[in-house]
Amino acid sequence: MLLSADDKKHIKAIMPSIAAHGDKFGGEALYRMFLVNPKTKTYFPTFDFHHNSKQISAHGKKVVDALNEASNHLDNIAGSLSKLSDLHAYDLRVDPGNFPLLAHNILVVVAMNFPKQFDPATHKALDKFLATVSSVLTSKYR
């Protein structure tokens, strides 16, 4: 999915705020995904799934750090996430259907925590960005 110059501007504007608290926002998005879609827990057999779990927060930070890295390479998201794509496709074999579930929960968390910044243009841009990231992470599933 092609990101317009306007999309890139909105992504660049909101990502530093998200990245500054990656453990909190990423953890909340994962917690919501696990709660609403329990089948997604299968990839984390040793996790404590309680709200504000240190394990969920730590993994949430990894998710947000990867998104932040991708946001720094909006013209080459595939290149910036290539190793992560390999990991998810070949080693972890994560169900590709899980990426859109997490993307949805990230949007929910961002909307809740940044209501003034999360205007329709930012919503659209972040949705397109997350869809692009999901597509990149599943591109090697063949």
Curated annotation (Swiss-Prot):
Can you quote a single GO CC term?
A: blood microparticle
Q: Which GO terms describe its biological process?
A: hydrogen peroxide catabolic process
Q: Name one GO molecular function term.
A: oxygen binding
User: Which portions of this protein are annotated as coiled-coil regions?
Assistant: none
* Tissue specificity annotation: Red blood cells.
Give the binding site residues for O2: H59
Q: Which UniProt keywords apply?
A: Heme, Iron, Metal-binding, Oxygen transport, Transport
Recorded hits in SUPFAM superfamilies, A to Z, give: Globin-like
Globin domain span: 2-142
What InterPro entries has UniProt attached to this entry?
Globin, Globin-like_sf, Globin/Proto, Hemoglobin_a-typ, Hemoglobin_oxygen_transport
Alphabetical list of CDD domains matching this protein = Hb-alpha-like
Which parts of the sequence bind heme b?
A: H88
Subunit and interaction comment: Heterotetramer of two alpha chains and two beta chains.
Q: Explain the purpose of this protein.
A: Involved in oxygen transport from the lung to the various peripheral tissues.
The similarity annotation says: Belongs to the globin family.
Query: Under which name does UniProt file this protein?
Result: Hemoglobin subunit alpha-1
The record lists the lineage as: Eukaryota, Metazoa, Chordata, Craniata, Vertebrata
